[in-house]
Amino acid sequence: MSIPTGFPSTNGRDGWANFDQATGFERELLDILRSARQSGAVNLFWITTDVHFAEAFRYTPFADAPEFHVYEIATGPMNSGIFPNRDFDPTLSPERLAFVGPGAATDVTTWEQAKSWFNFGTLEIDADGTLDAAIVDTSGDRRFELELQPSSR
């Protein structure tokens, strides 16, 4: 949600992060989040992919509702160019929980180095509603884990 996507940026963006673009996407996202908040939701979980690194965020988009959080995990792709981007849109008060990637694409010069950054995400919801999400590398190691309990309304 906060990671600008679309390349080159002169072609526009295909995500909600507005950065230097004034688009309707951000307003649309805020409408969706307001609706979820009004329905009583407190923990939303978003899955995004194809950003060429992995990252996890927790958002607290409404100052008057600190219990309302949105979580996002972005992963992958599993075997592609690595283009880490540490910039993100601060509009929804994001807190970065994890970043899995090199400092810069130029830091990766060999196949062995590249393999350490390839990743995918997993998501499991057990019978009691506990959500377990993870960023996993090609060795099967969990580089980041997040567990969310279902809310009681």
Report residues per predicted region.
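Long, structured stretches of catalytic cores involved in phosphate-ester chemistry, encompassing
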Residues: 1-153
